[in-house]
């Protein structure tokens, strides 16, 4: 019986983390003036996140385990793609406007892979 309680608590803790994560996405979406159509979390081997052409955002479940500022970087990066589809000058200037240290976070995520 204690094992079952432990698993339930783990599920509850993970559920709370997912809700906090999604809440953070909506906070950033409001700041960036974008409206994600769908948000999903799943295990991904080679990506931190992706945005489909129809506005579906998918985030790697590993984001639930890393530092908040790195998470914010991934969230802002993907949400900005709803406004700017490429990584050109406009995209980079918006990244700097919302996350001045975004390049540092990007490098840290590459190293952590």
Model regions and ranges:
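Walker B catalytic acidic pair
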Residues: 78
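Active-site-proximal or metal-binding-adjacent scaffold patches in catalytic folds
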Residues: 1-73, 82-113
């Amino acid at each position: 019986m204690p094992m079952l309680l432990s698993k339930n608590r783990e599920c509850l803790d993970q559920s709370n983390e997912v809700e906090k994560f999604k809440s953070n996405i909506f906070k950033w979406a409001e700041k960036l003036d974008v409206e994600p159509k769908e948000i999903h979390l799943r295990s991904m081997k080679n990506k931190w996140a992706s945005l489909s052409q129809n506005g579906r955002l998918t985030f790697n479940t590993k984001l639930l385990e890393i530092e908040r500022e790195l998470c914010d970087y991934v969230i802002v990066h993907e949400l900005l793609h709803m406004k700017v589809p490429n990584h050109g000058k406009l995209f980079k200037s918006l990244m700097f406007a919302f996350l001045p240290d975004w390049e540092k976070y990007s490098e840290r995520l590459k190293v952590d892979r």
